[in-house]
Curated annotation (Swiss-Prot):
This is UDP-N-acetylmuramate--L-alanine ligase. It is found in: Cytoplasm. Pathway: Cell wall biogenesis; peptidoglycan biosynthesis. It is an enzyme of class 6 (ligase). The gene is murC. It comes from Burkholderia ambifaria (strain ATCC BAA-244 / DSM 16087 / CCUG 44356 / LMG 19182 / AMMD) (Burkholderia cepacia (strain AMMD)).
Amino acid sequence: MKHIVKQIHFVGIGGAGMSGIAEVLVNLGYEVSGSDLSRNAVTDRLEALGARIAIGHDAANIAGANAVVVSTAVRSDNPEVLAARHQGVPIVQRAVMLAELMRLKQGIAIAGTHGKTTTTSLVASVLAAGGLDPTFVIGGRLISAGANARLGTGDFIVAEADESDASFLNLYPVIEVITNIDADHMDTYGHDFARLKQAFIEFTQRLPFYGSAVVCVDDPNVRQIIPFISKPVVRYGLSPDAQVRAEDIDARDGRMHFTVIREGRAPLAVVLNLPGLHNVQNALAAIAIATDLGVSDDAIQQALAEFNGVGRRFQRYGEVPSADGGQYTLIDDYGHHPVEMAATVAAARGAFPGRRLVLAFQPHRYTRTRDCFDDFVNVLSTVDALVLTEVYAAGEAAITTANGDALSRALRAVGRVDPVFVASVDDVPDALAGVARNGDVVITMGAGSIGGVPAKIVQHIQQKA
């Protein structure tokens, strides 16, 4: 007998990965409930759409649920998980629920260590401009849509594929993107980089024979796995052997201008409303998919020129008064791995040439700080001024040799930047007020609670006005 599902409960519904799936299910007509430790804009939006939201985790919250959705971040002793197990309610992993949504449509899954959210957003935006009206589930808020998910009427669903817990192996899309492969979340793979690369190969094996793997050939680790991909491959990037390639790249006024070369097609002049070479690569993935699906060149050009970005991905907050009577440019970014951070710093240098770059950085996870310690020191040493916070633990036990103080000491030993260390992220606005000067570019960066700092700075200014 088929198990009838009417109500679906999400444990940790306010998270980026969970909320998007929940929103799509609400729009499909399911009764959706969920719990989280605190309210945020995402839970408020879901509640307005009709979801039932509880603050705090309690067994009573799953009342009436026919399925309970969890992510790998949810502990097995969570009271709602225990209640579901006791009551015989199916417990479904987030990626499995995403896979079920993909079964309803043709899936386009975006994978890679870095750039998933921006690339997913670019693909969704270009397909929408081409009239394909895709469903999308994104790990950040697509600013033009005001949400991180949307139920479209078209045949495609565009979603991020998460390698951090190997859950992307639950997905069976028809098109896959691999942006890059880097050493992150290595606990999942037993600290064996070969196992991580093998997981990406296995990911491509989920494609049907008529599917395609769209891969960034600029990344050496992606290039290494191409011979082991048994499905059709489309190579994109800046490399000469890329089938979808960018040439004549020019950074101007915070935008990237370039020409796209595609096999059998006329060159396409593109203006991308994002800075940085890494975003040129991300846009090429979207162009490759859009071209394959028959989106017109005019629609591709329009979507990229008008792209408004994603929340916390080089998100601009405008000009902010500085303590010396001038003003500085405030930007917020989700970067938390040295490779991502280096790309964002390079993008900022290209978008704002000659201006002093101030970074406020909150490291994310002690294990990542430990594993990438020297790389963090190197990238943080490339900015002109630095405010550094204690590590955002994300549930991990503290590691004294990889905390904020240890990172500060290592940076001072190198001697290229003298960090201002603050123990709490709440102290970042005051620290920035003492560092930022007229004409500076200030970036708040990290995957933890520092994401709330720019809004606090802007709110403080509005209250003083």
